[in-house]
């Protein structure tokens, strides 16, 4: 009986890891759609989002079934409660990639981004995808040290976001209010994507150690 239970726990981790992978792919494609004004790629992200939503619902259901039927304690209870929190975080990652793709679609055939911020978003997108891929890995490995590294890499995203904001506030900005609003919202989408990847890593650390990092700050509270 317990063997079957732990197999179900492993299957749940695999589902969560797969969801992280799909969210990372979605953000990578959404970024390319944004940078290249690629309508077909944006549409693909929008269409494929249903895969993440479906897997999210199934993973959440699996976690609640385990919680209700198995009455887990200690480490197993931590694993299931953390999994429920991860489902929500990964689901939001997918939704944020969807927002990026929808922005690219809405402005097509024009480019959303002024040329001077393209480089920022290429790098912001790269970091976001790297964080998503890192979350995918640690969900399976449950390695708290690697999970801590994801939290450290999020500093790069924060720094890029600060630089982007300074560009928007510069008196030399000449692209108007609408472009500034688009850039601000898009920057926020990427920042929140990273925050949710960090939340996944934070939950992995809790799963493995029974406590949150000593320097812990809940993502999004900064």
From Swiss-Prot:
GO terms for cellular component: cytoplasm. Plays a role in the regulation of phosphate uptake. Belongs to the PhoU family. GO terms for biological process: intracellular phosphate ion homeostasis; negative regulation of phosphate metabolic process; negative regulation of phosphate transmembrane transport; phosphate ion transport. This is Phosphate-specific transport system accessory protein PhoU homolog 1. Keywords: Cytoplasm, Phosphate transport, Transport. Homodimer. Coiled coil: none annotated. It comes from Mycobacterium leprae (strain TN). One of its GO terms (molecular function) is protein homodimerization activity. It is found in: Cytoplasm.
């Amino acid at each position: 009986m317990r063997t079957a239970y732990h197999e179900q726990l492993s299957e749940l981790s695999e589902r969560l890891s797969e969801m992280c992978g799909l969210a990372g792919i979605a953000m990578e494609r959404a970024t390319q759609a944004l940078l290249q004004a690629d309508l077909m790629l944006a549409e693909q992200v929008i269409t494929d989002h249903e895969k993440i939503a479906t897997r999210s619902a199934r993973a959440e259901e699996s976690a609640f079934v385990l919680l209700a039927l198995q009455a887990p304690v200690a480490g197993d209870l931590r694993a299931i409660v953390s999994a429920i929190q991860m489902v929500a975080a990964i689901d939001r990652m997918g939704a944020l990639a969807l927002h990026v793709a929808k922005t690219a679609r809405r402005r097509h055939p024009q480019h959303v981004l002024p040329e001077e911020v393209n480089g920022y978003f290429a790098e912001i997108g790269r970091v976001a995808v790297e964080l998503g891929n890192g979350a995918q890995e640690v969900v399976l490995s449950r390695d708290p040290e690697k999970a801590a590294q994801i939290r450290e890499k999020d500093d790069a995203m924060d720094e890029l976001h600060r630089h982007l904001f300074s560009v928007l506030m510069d008196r030399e900005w000449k692209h108007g209010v609408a472009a500034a609003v688009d850039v601000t919202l898009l920057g926020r989408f990427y920042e929140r994507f990273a925050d949710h990847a960090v939340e996944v890593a934070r939950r992995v650390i809790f799963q493995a150690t029974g406590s949150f990092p000593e320097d812990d700050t809940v993502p999004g509270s900064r």
